[in-house]
Regions:
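Alpha-helix N-cap/helix-initiation motif
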Residues: 2, 16-17, 180-181
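Conserved N-terminal/central alpha/beta ligand/cofactor-binding core
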Residues: 3, 39-174, 178
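Core beta-strand elements of the Rossmann-like FAD/NAD(P) dinucleotide-binding domain
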Residues: 5-9, 177-182
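N-terminal Rossmann-like FAD-binding beta1-loop-alpha1 element of flavoenzymes
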Residues: 10-36
Length: 182
């Protein structure tokens, strides 16, 4: 394989949605090299661009963790991991603050307060953004931090280290070109 088709990095992230971008930025904060690969245009493909709300758990707003976790468990028909749900909620306010710092605007009331809407299914509250607000802000922040973004690459296979099953890379194919990338 030609060397120009081979890439090396400390962290490879497959998927350019909200989770992929947060993982990329947080890895760069630790000083490691990061490549983010996405089958479309990272930040504007998949489901993340359509998100117009964000659940930010904050005890200072009167939120109670048990109620939030119970709502997600019930609505998810108890197939989700409860500990993972708790962790996501406990980290959510910090991620909200990151989004604000990176330029994502959230809707406010006429009085200028943050607009929070409580779910009809339980105590969880959502914060709302204009349509397609997350993706461009996440992409801009990732690039600013030095994340290498590779758009329109379809990952075909994960590369495993001999014998122990550790993932050491991936093989991908550019969507609009011939050839493979490793």
């Amino acid at each position: 394989m030609p060397p120009e088709n081979m890439f090396e990095t400390d962290v490879l992230i497959i998927g350019g949605g909200m989770a992929g971008f947060f993982a990329a930025v947080k890895a760069r904060e630790r000083g490691v090299g990061v490549i983010l690969v996405n089958k479309g245009y990272a930040g504007q493909s998949g489901q993340s661009p359509w998100a117009d709300s964000f659940a930010a758990f904050n005890p200072e707003w009167g939120h109670e963790l048990e109620g939030w976790v119970n709502q997600v468990n019930r609505v998810g028909e108890y197939v989700n991991n409860r500990e993972w749900t708790e962790l996501c909620f406990l980290e959510s306010y910090a991620r909200y603050r990151d989004l604000v710092a990176w330029g994502v605007e959230f809707h406010r009331t006429e009085d200028g307060d943050l607009f929070r809407s409580t779910s009809s299914l339980g105590p969880c509250q959502a914060l709302f953004t204009p349509p397609r607000a997350h993706g461009p802000a996440l992409r801009k922040e990732a690039l600013k931090r030095g994340v290498r973004i590779m758009d329109r690459i379809m990952i075909l296979e994960l590369v495993r280290q001999d014998g122990d099953g550790v993932i050491t890379g991936a093989v991908g194919m550019p969507v609009a070109e011939d050839g493979f990338l490793v």
